[in-house]
């Protein structure tokens, strides 16, 4: 999420802003991806086939991250395309996470996992909001109608996921938010 936002701001500013932060975030993203990859390898024998399939799809999609980063650094990609690519990568990972729910046998665990997925989805919408606003601030221009529509849609989705979280969460889970 952070790399998406910084990349959007970098491209929108025509490379004038966010370069250093973006480069640092790429390293952080790579470190997190390595930890995730190791965890998946360690748990592979325990993962249901549906989860493995979703994780494989997300991993295959991320195989082009270096080419995307090069296009961003060289400013040959648009902020909109970059936003869409990172958003799809995140969606694929969230889909893999969501695949765990049907494999759970206890109703309370299913509910808790659905609460968790709603929280992650709310967080993702907040990340999209930040990336959109970062592009606006990076460009140093007024919010155009396309970005305004995107922002409105993001805020509506964020509100829906947050409502789902609050409906399913216990009082203590809700307070933790």
Predicted feature descriptions by range:
Residues 1-177:
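Hydrophobic alpha-helical segments
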